[in-house]
Amino acid sequence: MNEALNIADQTLVLHRHPRIKNETLQAWDSADEYLINYFSENELQKQLNENEQILLVNDSFGALTCYLQAFQRTVVSDSYLSINSIKLNMQRNRCPEENLLLQDSLQQFPENVKIVLIKIPKTLSYLEEMLQKLHAVITPETIVVAAGKVNMIHNSTLDLFEKYIGTTKTSLAKKKSRLIFSLPIIKEVPEKEIAITWEIEKLDWKIHNHANVFSRNHLDIGGRFLMDNLPKGDFSKVVDLGCGNGIIGMAASAAYPKAQITFIDESYMSIDSARINMQKNLPEEQAENARFVVNNGLVGFKPRSYDLILCNPPFHQQQTITDQIAWSMFNDAHFCLVDNGELVIVGNHHLNYQDKLERIFGNCEIVSQNKKFVILRAVKMD
């Protein structure tokens, strides 16, 4: 696996985080390379005046942030893992910290932006929210360039740039990536509420979903299956691990009203959605007793802290399909459960989580299954 990015007169050593053994994927892609080369070849830094800065949106592991270390820049991400990766790769490459501001996706953009570099995200609604925020701060002189894999740039993608920024065109493809150039036109664009709300009628819940929340348009059927098969017991400290909009943790709060529910996700928008949903749909006392944590799973949590962990594991990191996230979650759950504590998960049959749980816990049982999903229970033995 290549860790050295040699580009535009710089050599950067970049790692993906969290790090895993025998990593085969590098911490940048051809879209990063295309953006960096375009910036360098066109000497965009000469367009920066005093007190103006660069805005970077959706930098995955820090290639853009580290390359542009000499300039004042704000980096915006919805991913705790990405922000942590950027910090670690900054340290690895001895990049100065004083001219960098890292902020999450829920905050407004700075107003003194001259150059905007965007990595196209997987979720169109998230791109729209970022472009709507950008529309509020751009001027006719702002330079807006985006990059993404060819298969992620569609007419709908370009339509959003036309709507919120201005005249938009694309580059030729290189290494299966393409650039998007959008020339700002100052115009009135009606503000749109991009977060959506839908109901779970059976429970009389109204579910709020920010732009980048998993399954934001409907109730995830795997999550629904787990909600209907929660374990019976007198649980006091429960985790909804990888909580998304929080519906599994909410169901746990309804089933175990005296328990403290901890919602954990690496997406800032997910955690804020879960917080809003608890406050709107559960009794005040239960909502106030809940905890909401943006984190890389249970990393850094104390051992033997919880008696029930519920999980619908993701199998994507950025655009990469991986089972490493599930492995980490299961191992960390074993570490954080009390003796006789339970991990209950839902997953597609083909993911073969049962074998993983048996290897970690020494036991695993099928709680319920249907044609697509299986619910598994593993107990931490004394």
From Swiss-Prot:
Keywords: Cytoplasm, Methyltransferase, rRNA processing, S-adenosyl-L-methionine, Transferase
Domain of life, per lineage: Bacteria
UniProt-listed Pfam families: MTS
GO cellular component: cytoplasm
Keyword S-adenosyl-L-methionine: yes
Enzyme class: transferase
Catalytic activity, EC: 2.1.1.174
GO MF term set: 23S rRNA (guanine(1835)-N(2))-methyltransferase activity; nucleic acid binding
Catalytic activity from the UniProt record: guanosine(1835) in 23S rRNA + S-adenosyl-L-methionine = N(2)-methylguanosine(1835) in 23S rRNA + S-adenosyl-L-homocysteine + H(+)
Keyword Lyase listed: no
Subcellular location: Cytoplasm
Signal peptide extent: none
CDD domains in the cross-refs: AdoMet_MTases (cd02440)
Biological role: Specifically methylates the guanine in position 1835 (m2G1835) of 23S rRNA.
Family from the record: Belongs to the methyltransferase superfamily. RlmG family.
Matches recorded under PANTHER family: RIBOSOMAL RNA LARGE SUBUNIT METHYLTRANSFERASE G (PTHR47816:SF5), RIBOSOMAL RNA SMALL SUBUNIT METHYLTRANSFERASE C (PTHR47816)
Record-given protein name: Ribosomal RNA large subunit methyltransferase G
